[in-house]
Amino acid sequence: MSPKDYLAIVHCIAGLKERTRHAWMTSGRQESVAEHSWRMALMAYFLRDEFPTVDLTRVLLMALLHDMGEVFTGDIPTFEKTDADRAREHELRDEWIDALPAPYAAEVRSLFAEMDAMETEEAKIVKALDRMEAVITHNEGDPHTWLPLEYDLQRTYGVKEAAFTPVLKELRAEVNREVDEVIAGLNKETEL
């Protein structure tokens, strides 16, 4: 790959740092798509002993790349995203993949096909962590930024995706305990 082609990729993926997500960080600013993907990758890494038979490299690459389409569309919260939004994001993502140098295009296309099919343990882990990371970030941020529909969403988002394995099911249950603590804290504020 030429330095020019390499830098074109690097400049494009920089957009993940610029695109903000719906969640607010503890510092009072919105999380970026890059931060979300980065933490997902680390979450996967620290679960490696729980999943000794999975291809960790594929999981890490999926985690880092899974929201690449949002470079072009921005992040649309799950409760607002339509089928048309998803189709447009996939179309733009696929155009980006097609422009990658051949060996990378094939590998990245394969990763997205695997994630879209949701048949492998690797893809299921990534989907569960994607949902779980969003809930954890909401728990860590200011709950006063939550929309009314998010109180229920915090308890249910990603529960189904985590249920395929006891490890992630148990982890998601612990995340729900944190959700309950955050909501209980808000309820105490209202009582004062």
Predicted features by range, described:
Residues 1-192:
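Alpha-helical, largely C-terminal catalytic domains
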